[in-house]
A protein has these predicted regions:
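Catalytic strand-loop segment that frames the active site of acyl-thioester-processing enzymes
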Residues: 11-79, 93
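Hydrophobic beta-strand-centered segment that forms part of the acyl-chain substrate-binding groove
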Residues: 74, 80-121
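HotDog/MaoC-like acyl-thioester-processing domains
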Residues: 1-43, 109-113, 119-143
């Protein structure tokens, strides 16, 4: 903006091997108990399709339910990690003000039929799935 560097973004993306046939599913960690503030959304296929279009994300796990189930092995459409992170970032800004930095890590996929609860406790943020598992964690540093 006016020749000034305003935002720096870094991505560390880890792609894992497919699990061996018959291997047990990883155990999801429980989300922290208690929060200063929380709110929930109910993602649906239309939201995921629109977000895919907006972000030019062509991965079919976000908009093609038969593919997500039958080929990738998910229970339904997968909610985008960056969509969850954006909701956490908005929650942080609404409660704490302008951000200096924001970092997040996805830990368990959230399906389109699951309620996502966005929680904040100070600078710590997380997404809780309907079964109490932690789907994402984040930290916010305020300006």
């Amino acid at each position: 903006q006016d020749g000034q560097h305003c935002i720096a973004e870094e991505h560390d993306i880890v792609y894992r091997e497919d699990p061996a046939p018959g291997a047990p599913a990883p155990v999801a960690q429980p989300a922290p108990e208690g929060s200063d503030f929380s709110r929930s959304i109910h993602p649906d296929p239309v939201l995921l399709f629109r977000y895919s279009a907006l972000t030019f994300n062509g991965h079919r796990i976000h908009y093609d339910a038969p593919y997500a189930r039958d080929v990738e092995g998910y229970d339904g459409l997968v909610v985008h990690g960056p969509l969850l992170a954006q909701h956490l970032m908005l929650l942080a800004e609404e409660v704490g003000g302008a951000l200096r930095s924001f970092a997040f890590r996805a830990s368990s996929p959230l399906m389109h039929f699951e309620t996502a609860t966005f929680c904040r406790n100070g600078e710590d943020l997380w997404v809780r799935g309907p079964d109490g598992r932690q789907c994402m964690s984040a930290t916010a540093e305020f300006a």
